[in-house]
């Protein structure tokens, strides 16, 4: 199965995405990661106001197969979290690049986005597998 990814998204090696929207960055996990996890049953996210370091664990996603940590693709302050995904983890599974987003961050260093893979590079990486 070949995966397609929104062109504006940037991706970490650990399959989290960052999508800049003005001064904020929306964070989630890729459709590839969701597919690998299988049926998602629980999502744990940080609280609004928490500060995240780039590469640091910011929560976990539990599926019938495994529990996986998620890592911040950029450093910043959590300004919003997706309560709908917390209440209904299947939202993440149904639309990981849309309604299944996880966090909105105010990045402390927006230039960190440039170090992430663009959608084409990430797509080549995961589709080659």
UniProtKB/Swiss-Prot annotation:
- Which residues does the record list as N6-lipoyllysine (modified residue)? 65
Query: What does the record give as cofactor?
Result: (R)-lipoate
Gene3D superfamilies the UniProt entry points to: 2.40.50.100
Family, according to the entry, reads as follows: Belongs to the GcvH family.
Keyword Amino-acid biosynthesis listed? The answer is no
Q: What does this protein do?
A: The glycine cleavage system catalyzes the degradation of glycine. The H protein shuttles the methylamine group of glycine from the P protein to the T protein.
Oligomeric state and interaction partners are given as:
The glycine cleavage system is composed of four proteins: P, T, L and H.
Q: Which gene encodes it?
A: gcvH
What Gene Ontology cellular-component terms does the record carry?
Answer: cytosol; glycine cleavage complex
Q: Which domain of life is it from?
A: Bacteria
Where does the Lipoyl-binding domain lie? 24-106
Give GO terms for biological process.
glycine decarboxylation via glycine cleavage system
Q: What is this protein called?
A: Glycine cleavage system H protein
Q: How many cofactors are bound and how?
A: Binds 1 lipoyl cofactor covalently.
Provide this UniProt record's keywords sorted from A to Z: Lipoyl
- Is Plastid a UniProt keyword of this protein? no
């Amino acid at each position: 199965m070949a995966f397609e990814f929104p062109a504006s998204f940037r991706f970490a090696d650990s399959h989290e995405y960052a999508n800049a929207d003005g001064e904020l960055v929306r964070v989630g996990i890729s459709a590839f990661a969701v597919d690998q996890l299988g049926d998602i049953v629980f999502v744990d996210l940080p609280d609004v106001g928490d500060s995240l370091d780039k590469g640091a664990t910011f929560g976990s996603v539990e599926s019938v197969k495994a529990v996986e940590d998620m890592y911040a693709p950029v450093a910043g302050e959590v300004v919003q979290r997706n309560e709908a995904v917390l209440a209904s983890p299947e939202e993440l599974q149904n639309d990981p690049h849309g309604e299944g987003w996880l966090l909105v961050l105010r990045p402390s260093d927006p230039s960190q986005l440039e170090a992430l893979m663009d959608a084409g590079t990430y797509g080549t990486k995961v589709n080659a597998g």
